[in-house]
Amino acid sequence: MMHTNRRAFLQTLTAAGFALTGMGLAQASTGKPAAAAGQEVLAITSATHGHALEAAFVQGAQSAAARVQHSQLQGFDSSSFQQLHTLLNDQQETLLVGLLDDASATLVLDLVRSAGGRVLSEAHHRIAADATGWAQQLGQTLVSGQTGAATPAQPGRESRVALRCLI
């Protein structure tokens, strides 16, 4: 059992820490910066089956930010990865959000880390191909930096990786 004086001391330290940094409790809990006004956002998807899931994800990202570029990775097509490589090496800070298949996500995350980018979040999901409402909300959530409800794994569903990086 914690001694009363020690508990009060720890509570005071915690409160002082938040006051000194000027952080609200909501910001402190997420630790993820939202897209700044005017910041470039790149939304990437993988064209695995060409269904509406990817389009809904991009639509959600576009509703949460003013400037959103979209790049669709066509398998292991070099032109899509070349565009990403160019963005990784420019001097402009870009928020990268994506809804990708496992293989594409592995490559993208390796490129981001190799270029010194920061992976802010990465989540694995098993979802139905027609979960467009969920995908749209995910796009909004990743761009805004909010935490969204995780989708439980569902057997027999498609595997996707949602990611949020600062490049």
Q: What label would you give each PLM region?
A:
Residues 119, 123-167:
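Glycine-rich, aromatic-bearing surface loops/beta-hairpins
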Residues 33-39, 86-93:
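Flexible, charged surface loops at secondary-structure boundaries
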Residues 24-63:
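C-terminal segment of N-terminal export signals and the immediately downstream linker at the start
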Residues 75-78, 115-123:
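Extracellular or exported targeting regions of proteins
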Residues 1-20:
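N-terminal secretory signal peptides and thylakoid transit peptides that target proteins
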Residues 30-32, 62-88:
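A short, well-structured beta->alpha microelement
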Residues 107-108:
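Long, helix-rich, hydrophobic modules that act as membrane-proximal anchors or helical bundle/coiled-coil regulators
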Residues 44-49, 96-103:
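Structural motif
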